[in-house]
Amino acid sequence: MAAPVTVRVQRDDFDIAAEVSALCRARTDIGAVVTFSGLCRDEAGALSALELEHYPGMAEAEIERICHEAVERFGLQAATAIHRFGRMEPGANIVLVATASPHRQAAFDGANFIMDFLKTSAPFWKKEHHADGSAGDWVSAKDADDAARDRWTRR
């Protein structure tokens, strides 16, 4: 049986507990579930919102490709990846990655792999909106994100 993969790109918030429940529903072969939730953060106290845009259709396809690669590479029994778009205030959910496997290490590795590639390969763009009402810049990609992704190619 192929491992189920759930991918959604949506404007609405998600319920982490409900997503984990759906991931594990009627499964007795799962011994470990790992979740990662990414939140909108305000590091300097000047952010009122973060605006996320994506390339519809292409973002979903790329995330699905990444999830299927993780399932194959780590022997996952299920994977879920949800990414939001639109305007979000600090503290709001942005992304959820959940992986299930018989053992914890595969679940951890799968979640890390999905997040590292999602962050660098899926077509999303972020724009900051400042508390003073001004629009900030589009957020640039970080070298650290590329390095995190590249570690998987050296294994």
Curated annotation (Swiss-Prot):
Pathway: Cofactor biosynthesis; molybdopterin biosynthesis. InterPro entries: MoaE_sf (IPR036563), Mopterin_biosynth_MoaE (IPR003448). The keyword Transferase applies. It comes from the Bacteria. Gene3D superfamilies: Molybdopterin biosynthesis MoaE subunit (3.90.1170.40). Heterotetramer of 2 MoaD subunits and 2 MoaE subunits. Also stable as homodimer. The enzyme changes between these two forms during catalysis. Converts molybdopterin precursor Z into molybdopterin. This requires the incorporation of two sulfur atoms into precursor Z to generate a dithiolene group. The sulfur is provided by MoaD. This is Molybdopterin synthase catalytic subunit. The gene is moaE.
